[in-house]
């Protein structure tokens, strides 16, 4: 026993010096970073998220989880140029062709990072994603991202959707602390086989604790509210159907229309911030050039207004704390320039958006969001519209298939406007459909697509004779004539003296829930569970022999 022990001790003594001399990465543990505050934007209008500094930028927790209309695509002004990311506060540069790992200890969420963030238009970055993919990811981070040549790259990790969802549910005023590990090496290891930067013979490994506090939560509310606006050749607006909180208004010497366009809630921990700016921007460059700054104005209370002029006028975060809405004023000249440019029959979500700029974070501080409400702007001469009688963009229904169950009914208002009544008005329903036994049916599907269930559908309206006319309309994309509907006529006179009329009627789209054919799938199998479908209703009008 004593001999064996001696041999073991000798072997240990021989091996130990070799182990002690082995090369390794250089590990640096930085002092804890100062705690930082962030503002979280929950965008229910566009279904995405945005996080931005409430104070100092570093350590970074900044950017959106989705591209917006401000994404830079290689030309024009550079606004949004990367998706959201984090770093340890030192903004450390990376070496070309080296490998990079980033992982979190005490991560607030599983799978927090997707890869190496880069600026999308820099050489070596992906213009579409602003992401350099790693060889692998796990519950803590990503590994084996090769630093491409070209533009600068830094130790930045792109945030996953799971990270944003964690930030969303955090109460305002709460904090989290995580340890960020960032490691780069020139060794060409295979991360997909389990190798890691920290285990290589050379490189630099940085460790730092960072703390972030949720200082505010801005929730942009999609009200789904809808309103029609008809404009004449001089730009004078006339409100049609809808509930988007609009009214005619005069501001100074300009008359026009003002509407509540954004609804929001803003919770804070008392944060004071003036670097966050919010303002509207016209999406059509020709229209933006044609109108004056005061032809479009915006307000937090509907009485005190600021002109729209790129980034020159804005409301700050601090100003937004005392309100819950943003109003927009459109002058008659604004609408007149739309007419002159041939911009008509347009949705305001395609006409302008709101921009969010945090001047503290120039690379990731740009964001864009849609309005909460929608205006459908149409010419008063020769136009047709259809909107839900609930004044919502996306009406929906749900029900059960069984004997005696009520149909899913959708009501709509159809409006025509012209110098005379339309000579012909047509309507059709489009959506998933299948012909069974010579009849077209709307097809509802399960989430996995395995169950496809046929449903009959009808369009009906009251005729001028007081009778109800019903069409079989199984989502078949075929036009039906509704010219003989009972129209309510309202005359109008243009500022030029020309006369015309606005005609309105109602139509109902129904999907019976008690038809026996819906008890089985299109393959004649029984089914159980939930199925759904979406479709559209279209209208068109024709005027003939108009001088």
UniProtKB/Swiss-Prot annotation:
UniProt keyword list: Fimbrium, Signal
Induction profile: Negatively regulated by H-NS. Positively regulated by IHF and EcpR.
Primary location class: other
Localization (cell): Fimbrium
Signal peptide: 1-20
Tree of life domain: Bacteria
GO CC terms: pilus
Function: Part of the ecpRABCDE operon, which encodes the E.coli common pilus (ECP). ECP is found in both commensal and pathogenic strains and plays a dual role in early-stage biofilm development and host cell recognition. Tip pilus adhesin, which is required for assembly of EcpA into fibers.
The protein's assembly and partners: Forms polymers. Interacts with EcpA.
Family assignment from sequence similarity: Belongs to the EcpD/MatE family.
Name this polypeptide is given: Fimbria adhesin EcpD
């Amino acid at each position: 026993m004593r001999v064996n022990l001696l041999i073991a001790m000798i072997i240990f003594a021989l091996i130990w010096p070799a182990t002690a001399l082995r090369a390794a990465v250089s590990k640096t543990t930085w002092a804890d970073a100062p705690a930082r505050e962030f503002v979280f934007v929950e965008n229910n209008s566009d279904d995405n998220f945005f996080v931005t500094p409430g104070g100092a930028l570093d350590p970074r927790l900044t950017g959106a989880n989705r591209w917006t209309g401000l994404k830079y695509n290689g030309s024009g002004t550079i606004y949004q140029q990367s998706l959201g990311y984090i770093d340890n506060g030192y903004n450390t540069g990376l070496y070309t062709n080296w490998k990079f790992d980033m992982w979190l200890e005490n991560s607030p969420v599983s799978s927090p990072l997707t890869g190496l963030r880069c600026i999308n238009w820099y050489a070596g970055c992906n213009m579409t994603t602003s992401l350099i993919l790693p060889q692998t990811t796990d519950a803590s981070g990503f590994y084996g991202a090769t630093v491409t040549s070209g533009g600068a790259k830094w130790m930045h990790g792109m945030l996953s959707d799971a990270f944003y969802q964690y930030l969303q549910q955090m109460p305002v005023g709460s904090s989290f602390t995580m340890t960020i590990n960032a490691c780069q090496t020139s060794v060409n290891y295979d991360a997909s086989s389990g190798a890691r930067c920290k285990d290589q013979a050379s490189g630099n490994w940085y460790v730092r604790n960072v703390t972030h506090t949720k200082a505010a939560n801005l929730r942009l509310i999609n009200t789904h509210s809808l309103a029609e606006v008809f404009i004449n050749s001089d730009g004078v607006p006339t409100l049609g159907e809808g509930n988007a909180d609009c009214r005619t208004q005069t501001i100074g010497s300009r008359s026009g229309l003002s509407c509540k366009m954004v609804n929001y809630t803003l919770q804070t921990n008392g944060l004071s911030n003036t670097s966050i700016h919010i303002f509207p921007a016209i999406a059509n460059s020709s229209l933006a050039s044609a109108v004056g700054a005061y032809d479009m104005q915006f307000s937090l209370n509907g009485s005190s207004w600021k002109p729209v002029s790129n980034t020159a006028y804005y409301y700050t975060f601090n100003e937004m704390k005392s309100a819950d809405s943003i109003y927009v004023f459109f002058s008659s000249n604004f609408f007149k320039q739309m007419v002159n440019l041939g911009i008509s029959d347009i949705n305001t979500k395609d006409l302008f958006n709101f921009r969010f700029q945090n001047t503290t974070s120039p690379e990731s501080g740009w964001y864009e969001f849609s309005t909460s409400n929608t205006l459908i702007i149409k010419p008063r001469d020769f136009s047709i519209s259809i909107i839900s009688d609930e004044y919502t963009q996306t009406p929906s229904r749900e029900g059960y298939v069984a004997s005696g169950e009520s149909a899913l009914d959708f009501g709509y208002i159809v409006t025509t406007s012209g110098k005379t009544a339309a000579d012909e008005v047509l309507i059709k329903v489009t959506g998933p459909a299948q012909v069974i036994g010579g009849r077209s049916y709307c097809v509802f599907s399960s989430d996995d697509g395995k169950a496809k269930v046929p449903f009959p559908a009808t369009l009906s309206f009251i005729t001028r004779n007081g009778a109800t006319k019903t069409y079989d309309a199984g989502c078949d994309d075929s036009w039906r004539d509704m010219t003989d509907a009972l129209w309510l006529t309202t005359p109008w006179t243009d500022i030029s003296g020309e006369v015309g009329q606005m005609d309105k009627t109602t139509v109902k789209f129904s999907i019976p829930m008690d038809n026996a054919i819906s008890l089985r799938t299109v393959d004649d199998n029984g089914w159980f569970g939930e199925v759904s479908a979406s479709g559209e209703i279209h209208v068109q009008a024709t005027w003939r022999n108009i001088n």
